[in-house]
Amino acid sequence: MTQRANADSFLEQLKLTYGPKEFLTAFFFKAVDAAARRGVYLEFGTFSDLLRVNESNLDSWMPLTTSFREHPGGATNETGFVILGRNLAGEVVATQAARIFDWHNTNFKAEAESLRFFYRDPARDRRAGEACFVSAPAAETISGKVALGGGIWYRPDFRRLKLGEIIPRIGRAYALTLWNYDSLIATITQQNVQKAFDKRLGFLDITPSSVVMRRSATVPDGDLDLALARMTPMQLVDDLFGFLAGFDAEIDARIDERRA
């Protein structure tokens, strides 16, 4: 199957269960086409695929957070999904993932500080001295059905193509129609906040330096200073409406030639 055929297959595999279906259909067609015009053809993958791509690209991507690993984080293809973007040569050049959590009797602050957000079994798998401190005022209100977006990576030669404005929105929109979540969250490094990455992703509700990891397994020195970003379904729909109305899907055809 050609990569262009894969993109058509990806659209066919999208299961629209919740939300404004006609509106979401229009968004998905425009967004998937926008990625294809940039030489990136989308398909669904697995969390094993995501980890394999991460481990093969550590020169341009920090180690995958445990929340998006099957072991020890508990990520499964039944409670999450992975989107891969391939170039015409079939190489993975972009990734995106999402998980759903049932937090009807708990909240983000409790789950993160207990490390259950990061590990299936924190008592067994946490590093010695590993801890998480959450200071975001909204953290205790993030409960119910909560989707986590992340696992974002673009191969360096595919950056500056606005893929960060396209593929994460596809992931968030699919999470909404698949799970009908109450909130979608993401943790963003301070470096990416300084680059206004959160704004390009469409987040309006973000608290910098509000999730602090000590002795994290994700980074060599063990410390991470993260921003907590949150988006409600209504905020997502408003954001997607803006994308449909204002995002220019067209791009110089020479980019497709360079990416082939």
Give, region by region, the residue ranges found by the protein language model.
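Short, flexible loop/turn elements at secondary-structure junctions
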Residues: G85-A89, I100-D102, G151-F158, Q190, ...
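Acyl-donor binding region in acyl/amide transferases
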Residues: K109-V211, R215-P220
